[in-house]
Amino acid sequence: MIILKRLLQDKGAVIALGIIVLYVFLGLAAPLVTFYDPNHIDTANKFAGMSFQHLLGTDHLGRDILTRLIYAIRPSLLYVFVALFVSVLIGSILGFLSGYFQGFVDALIMRACDVMLAFPSYVVTLALIALFGMGAENIIMAFILTRWAWFCRVIRTSVMQYTASDHVRFAKTIGMNDMKIIHKHIMPLTLADIAIISSSSMCSMILQISGFSFLGLGVKAPTAEWGMMLNEARKVMFTHPEMMFAPGIAIVIIVMAFNFLSDALQIAIDPRISSKDKLRSVKKGVVQS
């Protein structure tokens, strides 16, 4: 509750949360928000300008851009939520087992993580696309295969830190069950860390699925997706540049929202982190990358 109170005192975090909630609502309630079919082709009305009927105009096939932008939230954001949830779930279970019990269990899980992290996520995704073909489901599968190991390592480090604390040692001394110790004394402390790495990971996953769709390797046509919309707009970017603005701005806004939320979570958990320290760490990360 203290962390939530600090988070809500940050105006940037509140705005970021509002944007994320708005995106999720629009994605889930897309049929109620817009009355157009995102895949309805009307060549007689192609490249129509902004109007009351089409607030953002139409594309090269006469499809309403705003409608496709809203429906594109589902593969671009909601599918990523599913992949992130499964990845965090697998990584958390293995991370808790590895960090708490250590020994042989820790060595076995860490070697499995080493194997998975030895392959770049883009290489794994391309391999799955080559084996099973294009589609959002294959990209989601690649997210899960590559991300769980990273989450496992981060959560393991956090669990090992809390396992060495005095209150956990006292709980072991009085004979408390291991699962009960994890559930009551360690899990609540690690939830904040999990929330931070999850929110920061969302940005790269959104950019990755949009990037693959932009290259024609992601979501299959005619399903609306931001990266695919950018690819379609690329062909007419000099004659109708406005077609690129809508999906591009949508991606930038949601990625910035998750970035702000991740930074705000870190400050809410550790108020000693100042804006100056945060700016310095961001610059250092940019230089290293």
UniProtKB/Swiss-Prot annotation:
Domain of life: Bacteria
Residue span, ABC transmembrane type-1 domain: 73-262
Upregulation: Repressed by zinc.
Main localization, broad class: membrane
Cross-referenced InterPro entries: BP-dependent_transpt_permease (IPR050366), MetI-like (IPR000515), MetI-like_sf (IPR035906), OppC_N (IPR025966), Staphylopine_ABC_permease (IPR053474)
Topology in the lipid bilayer: Multi-pass membrane protein
Record field: transmembrane: 13-33, 77-97, 115-135, 194-214, 249-269
UniProt GO MF annotations: transmembrane transporter activity
Function: Part of the ABC transporter complex CntABCDF (Opp1) involved in the uptake of metal in complex with the metallophore staphylopine (StP). Involved in the import of divalent metals ions such as nickel, cobalt and zinc. Probably responsible for the translocation of the substrate across the membrane. Plays a major role in nickel/cobalt import in zinc-depleted conditions. Contributes to virulence. Required for full urease activity in vitro.
Full protein name: Metal-staphylopine import system permease protein CntC
Organism: Staphylococcus aureus (strain NCTC 8325 / PS 47)
GO biological process: cobalt ion transport; nickel cation transport; zinc ion transport
Similarity comment: Belongs to the binding-protein-dependent transport system permease family.
Gene name as annotated: cntC
Gene3D superfamilies listed in its UniProt record: MetI-like
Annotated keywords: Cell membrane, Cobalt, Cobalt transport, Ion transport, Membrane, Nickel, Nickel transport, Transmembrane, Transmembrane helix, Transport, Zinc, Zinc transport
Knockout consequences: Deletion of the cntABCDF genes decreases nickel and cobalt intracellular levels and decreases virulence.
The protein's assembly and partners: The complex is composed of two ATP-binding proteins (CntD and CntF), two transmembrane proteins (CntB and CntC) and a solute-binding protein (CntA).
Subcellular location: Cell membrane
Activity control note: Nickel/cobalt import is reduced in the presence of zinc.
GO cellular component: plasma membrane
